[in-house]
Each structure stands twice: as C-alpha cells, then as structure tokens.
Amino acid sequence: MDSSERKPLVTPDALSARIRRAWEGRISGCQLGKPVELLSMREGHEALTSYLASVDSLPLRDYVGYRTGAGVQPACCRGQLTRSEPDDDINYSVLALWLLERHGAQLTTADVARAWLNLLPAGATFTAERAAYRVLLEHADDRFPHGAEAGFDLSECSDNPYNDWIGAQIRADVYGWVCPGQPGLAAELARRDATLSHRDDGVYGAMFVAALGAALAGVTPGNALAHALEQIPAEAGVAQAVRLGAGLAHDVDGGAAIRAHYDGLSPVGTLNNLAIVVWALYSHLDDFSAAIGEAVAAGLDTDCNGATVGGLWGIQGDAIPTQWTAPWQGRVALGLAGHDEVTLAALVERTTRVALALADQGQGPSRRKKDLP
C-alpha cells in the first residue's frame, strides 16, 4: 500500500475521540430511523416517503417529525427525545462491549451464547436471534450459562430460516471500533458472534461491517472499502452488495436502484440493507446528516441502517453535529438484564479501554490474516 494512501493510526486520545463519535453516530442514526422502522418494513417505501413528506421531513436532515394516526413511535421524533430509547441495535452493541471486556480477543461463540442467556431477554430478540435462543433454551445444559459446556453442537442454533437476514450485521460495529487498523481481527471477532445465529451471507455482512469500521481508522475511505472486502469471499452475495452500493455512490436514485435490484428480498435482509448502507455512507462521507438521512429515507430496515451508517461515519473521526446528540443528552436506555440505562461517557471510556487492551495484547488471532501493515 502506498504510504500516501494511509492515515496515521490513532493515538489513545484520538482513539477515544473517534470512539465517542462512533457511539454518537450510531445512537443518533438509530434514533432517527426508529420511529419509522415498522412503517417502512410493513407498508413499504412509498408509505415511508408519504409520511416523511407529511411532517416536513424531506429531505431528511433532522429527527423525524410526528403526527398521530400513522403508527409512528413518538418518543424518538423531533422535539420529543429526552434520551436514546431502547433498541435492539444498541442492546447488541453494548452486549458486544460487555463480552469484549471479559474475553477480549479470546471471545468464543459459546461466550456469546452464555451472554444471551444471562443478559438478553428472549422478548428482545427477533427472527434469527429468537430462533437461536429457542434452540439454546431447549438443548443447552442447565449449567451452560454459568460456564459448563453446552452439551450439544452450537451450530444447530444457526439452522433457521432467517440466517441470512440482518441480525448479525447489527451486532458487529463495536468489534471494528476496538480494532483500529486490524480489519482481519475485527472480522474474526464479528464472525464468532455472528455464527451463533447466522450462516453464509448473514455472517459475511457482520464481518464486513466490523472490518470496515476497523479499516477506516488506518486508511482512506476508498481503501478501507477494499480492505474490508478482503475479509469475505469475493463471490459472496455480500461482496456483490457492497460493490453495488459503492458503484451507486453519489447517484441520487441509488436507493431506488438498490430496492429494485433486490425486489422480493425481505426488508430485513442482509444484502439489500448493506447495499443501502454503503451507498448512503460513500455518497456523503463529508456530511453526517445527509449520510444517515438518506440511509433512513431509502427505507427497508431504517433504524438498523441509520445506526450502521452513523457508527461508520463517526469512526472516521469527524465531529457529529450537536443537533443530533443534544436531544438525547448522553442518556442511553437499554433492554438488557440489569442494565436499564448507561451514559455515553461510560460507553466511550469502556470501549476505549477495550481497544487499548487489545492493542497491548498484540494483533491476536486473525482468520484471514489481512490486517493493515
């Protein structure tokens, strides 16, 4: 790699600042998409666009406006936010942090399964995660949550009809944030988490998102995309989705083109949503509001895509506009057992500490051995 293509790997203070912006971006993007998530998934893009227009939220560059009778969640709408409301996307990010604090680079899929049983309410899981959870409850040894062996093959948990949907992808971001310049390690950590519930493209989507977050700390955005793609098979559907989204960057009709390309795919699929993420991010690398706004306005899984774009945009290091962060006041509500609310400051401090600990330990295992030099 030509040295002119590199950005300097971050100092501890700069790393902390990037991680803060990643959390700010992820939480803000999630809260932007959360009010219209069900509207988008159940009624489609036309209904989403009609609603946004009716509340003067197009182009989408601020939190969504609210009107009654539309099935929209008011707590996350413009003028209503007082904290980040609980959401599974943020639950999984905090759960990944909890796992890394305890296991670091030695994290295993069994560790993830135990954490689910101990901390993640079954009612807060959906599709592939709920199917995997059900298998754990039915087949795992009663002592498994407390450290015993599972007593069955954990790969049975991912044998479900949703294993190529978006669930694993939304669990992956933090693995990238704590591995700056190490996309291989980030992808491997995300893989170990993802394989509990997902297979094939469902896993590759998680690996790609984690790897991209890690690579953005070390190289320019264009090169980061290439390094993240190195972590997954070139022929995978995820790789094709990434190339589609990147190829449509700066095309104002990119969202429509992606929806048409994946017509018939579930609105919570991995491929269509990842293509939206890449398109929105790479169309607006210098404009946070436009990046998350276009990701959400494009439809499909709006809170997931807003969150993923927001976190990836933030990890680059540029400041998140205060119009997005001020309304939720550094308060992050959760739906994890024993964890009702946490502060942004605590998340930043804990995540930075994990990242520095991983750096002190060295690179650690990397499945594909393609971290940055």
Residue spans for each PLM region:
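Structured, active/binding-site neighborhoods that engage oxygen-rich ligands
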Residues: 1-373
